[in-house]
Amino acid sequence: MANTVSAKKMTRKIAKRTAINRSRRSRMRTFMRKVEEAIASGDAANALAALRSAEPEIMRASQKGIVHKNTASRKVSRLAARVKALQA
């Protein structure tokens, strides 16, 4: 348990930041799940639309430090490849 005033404040700040990060991570995963569901249903147009909305969310999460830049790029790349294969 935090004893000093500054330690207590840091505990509050960490809790606040954790909640924000959890929300952003959840939002990113929701957008990715929409792409996955569109791919699973076989709807190429819907999958492409979902990918176009998911890509900025994933990259925004990387800019905010939720995921590493390379991880975000890898996720976008793999989703894009699956959507492209669906269109072919």
From Swiss-Prot:
Keywords: Ribonucleoprotein, Ribosomal protein, RNA-binding, rRNA-binding. The keyword Translocase does not apply. One of its GO terms (cellular component) is small ribosomal subunit. The keyword tRNA-binding does not apply. It holds the Pfam family Ribosomal_S20p. GO terms for biological process: translation. One of its GO terms (molecular function) is small ribosomal subunit rRNA binding. Transmembrane segments: none annotated. Belongs to the bacterial ribosomal protein bS20 family. Binds directly to 16S ribosomal RNA. This is Small ribosomal subunit protein bS20. It comes from Methylobacterium nodulans (strain LMG 21967 / CNCM I-2342 / ORS 2060). The gene is rpsT.
